[in-house]
Amino acid sequence: MVQKSRNGGVYPGTSGEKKLKVGFVGLDPGAPDSTRDGALLIAGSEAPKRGSVLSKPRTGGAGAGKPPKRNAFYRKLQNFLYNVLERPRGWAFIYHAYVFLLVFSCLVLSVFSTIKEYEKSSEGALYILEIVTIVVFGVEYFVRIWAAGCCCRYRGWRGRLKFARKPFCVIDIMVLIASIAVLAAGSQGNVFATSALRSLRFLQILRMIRMDRRGGTWKLLGSVVYAHSKELVTAWYIGFLCLILASFLVYLAEKGENDHFDTYADALWWGLITLTTIGYGDKYPQTWNGRLLAATFTLIGVSFFALPAGILGSGFALKVQEQHRQKHFEKRRNPAAGLIQSAWRFYATNLSRTDLHSTWQYYERTVTVPMISSQTQTYGASRLIPPLNQLEMLRNLKSKSGLTFRKEPQPEPSPSQKVSLKDRVFSSPRGVAAKGKGSPQAQTVRRSPSADQSLDDSPSKVPKSWSFGDRSRARQAFRIKGAASRQNSEEASLPGEDIVEDNKSCNCEFVTEDLTPGLKVSIRAVCVMRFLVSKRKFKESLRPYDVMDVIEQYSAGHLDMLSRIKSLQSRVDQIVGRGPTITDKDRTKGPAETELPEDPSMMGRLGKVEKQVLSMEKKLDFLVSIYTQRMGIPPAETEAYFGAKEPEPAPPYHSPEDSRDHADKHGCIIKIVRSTSSTGQRKYAAPPVMPPAECPPSTSWQQSHQRHGTSPVGDHGSLVRIPPPPAHERSLSAYSGGNRASTEFLRLEGTPACRPSEAALRDSDTSISIPSVDHEELERSFSGFSISQSKENLNALASCYAAVAPCAKVRPYIAEGESDTDSDLCTPCGPPPRSATGEGPFGDVAWAGPRK
């Protein structure tokens, strides 16, 4: 039987059984589960496929020998030698100092060998040093070639050839060949050959170049020259022009009189030695013309010839300072990396986050509980016992987080030791195999291969190293919910192990589903403290290196501030708008000015809104003027009302006269006799004129407002109430001009007969507020404004109008599709229109009759 792992693979059985290939269930062609949907499509043909890591058998089983340690030692030695030769640090400089002294000694002896007095004494020592140098350099060269294999790009024979083609390796092989040639020629005793090959000894000067294996000095020089290349080219170019011009003019002046300037080449030599401030004195001008020209060009040319030295010096100084600053900045890498790591763990160990598991898995693998191994008397095996000072802690862990402790016999005793969580996980019933069912003496403990090897070597030591498979199994064991599911599952054994069922009689396992809350809180506290410490260390590493560093930080901050201000200014310009100023020259001189394009800025939009509000205000003024004209309100009183902005009046006061008028209103009702003429027009009988003393007219609109009461829509504080037309001005006396008929109408209007009933006044809204107008009424007219009054109120008003002007046509309602402005009265401009008949004192107010 085999056990399927989480990834769908299987562990191979014993050597006696059929070996199963590790793979995914349902993906192998011809497998029992290959009939699943999509399995054949994924598997493809049965041709041999490329092997993967899952297909490789597990190495280092119980029957296998020790893993070869030569590979690890081989790689370690390669890395060590490569670092010593190519990247020396610390005590590795001792070897390079020894090589430098050896090369320098050979160079000094080569110099002394050219002197006749020291030739014989220096040749013997030089011969010995040459042999030592050749041996050292030869061995070092081959070691370099071999150690370069630690780098991935230099592995294999092609990689070695690539490493051998490096410039410094080429110099090494050239010096080695030259040294061997010189040594071979000197050992033959041939005088001619020795004198001819003696010059090859100076090839040993190239050995000094190899002292700088990494080429730091050459890189520094190249970076300085490249950084100041423009300045150097300018100085050299102008200096070269001065050299040519000065040499040519001095040559022309000294050609016939001075033998030192016979050719132009002599003049160039003189100019170069003079402008470079060397001045050998072998050539000099003798005529006064030549001396004057030489002095003039010397003052100009020397300054340009000296410029490259200053440029290179300052460049070297700046570059070295920059390198020191860069090294100082590199010291911030470790604190920054530690801060990032601690910040992530501080974030990931938040107890409220339930979606982050990797950090907790790290602590699950690293947390250990010390245990004591003691030998049992029954089976002669050892079991894990916690120390006395940790019994209470383990009891609490067991009670809080479901930790399970069970006894298990161990195959061999061991002294007191600190057992890691991995050992306790693998000393589980999953690792217990018995030859006979129910026989505890035959039980064995399954361990990892590394543990078996270490126990064979030294039984008293605890196995510390465990393979990747053991770690994966440990992570799986951490998440096992209970023992029942583990006992029912099938077991898988490594090669060389017996496959048996679990022994349920004697089990011992330390299994935890998750860390305890208390342990999590402790880990959280440690992460917080580490984060604070890392933050403090990183802040300490951010201290400025020098004054230039401070200035650089301030300049960088200033540039950042300027960029932010520029961005803010652009956004402000986009919002406010910054249009180009239009001058008189740019204006088009024409009869009609062209419309300017709309400004997309916020200020342009606000201006457009203001224009629309102004247009709406004009329309409202126009509608209010129509209302005042229709209701007969004088403009002076309306302006006084809106200008004063008086508060709402008190509740209406009912005077005794109003009560008496209310009591006598039924006696003053005038019966209106309607008759129809042959043309179909209505004729109204005029009521008798009542004396004005019986019903005194009102003198102000406040009294009229008090008499009418409150509006049906309510007196809300946010509504602007338009005053009702006064009783003595409803006939529009401003248009009639004080006629006698208007005076009679005012008298008639003051009578109770002409006064509308209280119910009509209550139902109608004579005191009209603008928000009380219904939307349906607004849609009836083209002007968007209409006034609704009850039919009874309009009939009563019509009777009063008929008393004075019987021929006037009264239109109490407005037909659909017709607006208030359709009548001649509502014309906003021009003189007041006449009536249809043009007669009567109220012709100005009467509406025109229907058109025939």
Swiss-Prot record:
GO terms for molecular function: ankyrin binding; calmodulin binding; potassium channel activity; voltage-gated monoatomic cation channel activity; voltage-gated monoatomic ion channel activity; voltage-gated potassium channel activity. Expressed in brain and sympathetic ganglia. In brain, expressed in cortex, hippocampus, and cerebellum. In sympathetic ganglia, expressed at lower levels in celiac ganglia and superior mesenteric ganglia than in superior cervical ganglia. Residues 1-90, 146-163, 216-227, 315-852 are cytoplasmic. KCNQ2/KCNQ3 heteromeric current can be increased by intracellular cyclic AMP, an effect that depends on phosphorylation of Ser-52 in the N-terminal region. KCNQ2/KCNQ3 are ubiquitinated by NEDD4L. Ubiquitination leads to protein degradation. Degradation induced by NEDD4L is inhibited by USP36. GO terms for cellular component: axon initial segment; cell surface; mitochondrion; node of Ranvier; plasma membrane; synapse; voltage-gated potassium channel complex. Residues 264-276 dip into the membrane without crossing it. Residues 317-522 are annotated as: Mediates interaction with calmodulin. It catalyses: K(+)(in) = K(+)(out); Rb(+)(in) = Rb(+)(out); Cs(+)(in) = Cs(+)(out); Na(+)(in) = Na(+)(out). Pfam families: Ion_trans (PF00520), KCNQ2_u3 (PF16642), KCNQ_channel (PF03520), KCNQC3-Ank-G_bd (PF11956). The chain crosses the membrane at residues 91-113, 124-145, 164-183, 197-215, 228-253, 288-314. It comes from the Eukaryota. Changing C527R: No loss of calmodulin binding in the presence of Ca(2+) compared to WT. No difference with WT in current suppression in the presence of Ca(2+). It is found in: Cell membrane. A 1,2-diacyl-sn-glycero-3-phospho-(1D-myo-inositol-4,5-bisphosphate) binds at R214, K230, K327. Residues 440-457 have a biased composition (Polar residues). A motif (Selectivity filter) lies at residues 277-282. Residues 583-592 have a biased composition (Basic and acidic residues). Phosphatidylinositol-4,5-bisphosphate (PIP2) potentiates the activation of KCNQ channels by enhancing the electro-mechanical coupling of the voltage-sensing domain (VSD) and the pore-forming domain (PD). In the closed state of the channel, PIP2 is anchored at the S2-S3 loop; upon channel activation, PIP2 interacts with the S4-S5 linker and is involved in channel gating. Calcium suppresses KCNQ2 and KCNQ2-KCNQ3 channel currents, with calcium-bound calmodulin inducing a change in channel configuration which leads to the reduction of channel affinity for PIP2 and subsequent current suppression. GO terms for biological process: action potential; action potential initiation; apoptosome assembly; brain development; cellular response to calcium ion; cellular response to xenobiotic stimulus; cognition; dentate gyrus development. Pore-forming subunit of the voltage-gated potassium (Kv) M-channel which is responsible for the M-current, a key controller of neuronal excitability. M-channel is composed of pore-forming subunits KCNQ2 and KCNQ3 assembled as heterotetramers. The native M-current has a slowly activating and deactivating potassium conductance which plays a critical role in determining the subthreshold electrical excitability of neurons as well as the responsiveness to synaptic inputs. Belongs to the potassium channel family. KQT (TC 1.A.1.15) subfamily. Kv7.2/KCNQ2 sub-subfamily. Heterotetramer with KCNQ3; forms heterotetrameric M-channel responsible for the M-current. Homotetrameric; forms a functional homotetrameric channel resulting in the expression of a small M-current. Interacts with calmodulin; the interaction is calcium-independent, constitutive and participates in the proper assembly of a functional M-channel. May associate with KCNE2. Interacts with IQCJ-SCHIP1. Interacts (via the pore module) with SLC5A3/SMIT1; forms a coregulatory complex that alters ion selectivity, voltage dependence and gating kinetics of the channel. This is Potassium voltage-gated channel subfamily KQT member 2. The gene is Kcnq2.
